[in-house]
Design a protein with these regions (language model features):
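Solvent-exposed loop/turn segments at secondary-structure junctions
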Residues: 44-46, 108-109, 217, 237-239, ...
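Surface-exposed recognition segments
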Residues: 299-369
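Conserved SET/PR-domain catalytic core that frames the SAM/AdoMet-binding pocket
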Residues: 34-44, 49, 292-294, 300-302, ...
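Short Gly/aromatic-enriched secondary-structure transition segments
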Residues: 52-64, 316-323
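Short, solvent-exposed loop/turn elements at domain surfaces
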Residues: 46-56, 110-112, 239-242, 314-315, ...
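Acidic glycine-/aspartate-rich tracts in secreted/extracellular proteins
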Residues: 45, 108, 118-122, 224, ...
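Short aromatic-cysteine micro-motif
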Residues: 1-35, 62-297
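Hydrophobic helix-coil surface modules that form long, contiguous segments used
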Residues: 37, 42-43, 51-55, 69-71, ...
Length: 369
């Protein structure tokens, strides 16, 4: 274990030109991308908190839902086979959170999404942004319609060079349209306006997979006892919230809200989106940072958490295959076994609140990521 940056040297990779359709004399650009991940170890955990809306409860080998259930109706998930949801079988391959898994430490940042867009063809780009890649240089790429006020919605991704003919667009992020430095132009702010298909495409490209709602609860609560109505940071309430649009180092890699700590939409006080992990510092506790038991950031605040539910047939059919780095010609994920419809999300900050777990929402919105 440990903390802090890593300096890894001497890494090499081999690239077979012929396997990718290139001649030995061709010049190519190879880019390396890294995503910080958190390891969630194998262990039992408790599903549901007994009080949150539509919270899970487990009696014998059957999962069900219902707020107001007694604490003893919450069940320990042990990785057993033969589980059901309201009597419907949950396939053994469906990830229940008991086995170890990796999860992204942060939400997708605007810079990470720019990196993703800049590896796609023009046809693929057109599916992953609401504004056409052929729009004028410096056009907003993600903010659209009535959502283009950057001081409110805070998505600074722009078309740096418009697509022409069959040449893809080049994207960047710039608050004013002149300075394209990522560290001073919101590159570390979570990327809002992403819909379900955008997220799946990014995961396929990054060779990752979606997580399930049971894995969401495990990543948040860990193997610890339940605190009824708890948020990801392990307390029921009392967390101060970001109350204004006022920031220190706004748009920079060091951005923090002047009114800490968590940033959740329901209060009506906070801006739509902030820098990923904005409340975590060397000196902060888990409570102050808003982190989960394992140190995953923003699981109860900032943007919606999208996951694969256990309560619908489409969700239960999920097979946890990882992406392969390639998208379809039209820019969609094409991984066998992934849900065809939106798998639901966690908007409310209690980690067992399933109010939106079955929401089939395909639109883009300032609070979706």
């Amino acid at each position: 274990g440990g903390a802090g940056p890593n300096e890894i040297k001497g890494i090499k990779t081999k690239f077979n030109y012929a396997d990718h359709g290139y001649a030995p004399t061709d010049s190519i650009i190879v880019s390396v991308f890294a995503i910080e991940m958190v390891y969630i170890p194998k262990s039992t955990f408790i599903a549901g908190d007994g009080v949150s809306t539509n919270t899970l409860r487990k009696i014998d080998n059957d999962l069900s839902v219902g707020a107001g259930q007694q604490v003893w109706d919450m069940g320990i998930v042990k990785g057993e086979t033969g589980l059901t949801f309201k009597g419907e079988p949950i396939p053994d391959v469906y990830p229940k959170g008991f086995e170890a898994f990796y999860i992204m430490k942060h939400e997708i940042s605007q810079h990470a999404y720019v990196d993703f867009l800049n590896t796609l063809t023009q046809e693929q780009q057109a599916s992953r942004v609401p504004v056409k890649p052929t729009a004028a240089d410096k056009s907003w790429a993600m903010a659209f319609g009535s959502y283009t006020n950057p001081s409110v919605y805070r998505n600074y991704i722009r078309i740096r060079t418009a697509a022409i003919a069959d040449v893809a667009a080049i994207y960047g992020h710039s608050i004013g349209g002149t300075n394209w430095d990522r560290e001073s132009n919101g590159g570390n702010i979570a990327c809002n306006f992403l819909n379900w298909d955008d997220g799946l495409a990014y995961l396929d490209w990054a060779a990752l997979r979606p997580f399930t709602e049971l894995e969401y609860e495990k990543a948040g609560r860990g193997h610890k006892r339940v605190i009824r109505g708890e948020m990801a940071w392990g307390y029921k309430a009392g967390m101060p919230v970001a109350a204004t649009n006022s920031f220190t180092d706004a748009g920079l890699a060091s951005e923090v809200a002047k009114d800490p700590q968590a940033n959740y939409l329901e209060t009506g006080k906070a801006p739509w989106v902030m820098r990923v992990g904005a409340f975590a510092k060397d000196s902060t506790t888990r409570y102050e940072s808003g982190g989960t038991y394992y140190g995953v950031m923003n699981m109860s605040d900032n943007l919606w958490e999208r996951c694969v539910n256990v309560s619908t047939p489409d969700g239960r059919s999920f097979v946890p295959n990882h992406g392969d780095g390639y998208l379809s010609m039209t820019g969609t994920a094409d991984v066998d076994g992934w849900p065809s419809a939106a798998g639901g999300g966690f908007r409310s900050f209690q980690i067992s609140n399933r109010q939106y777990a079955e929401l089939n929402e395909t639109a883009r919105h300032p609070s979706y990521g």
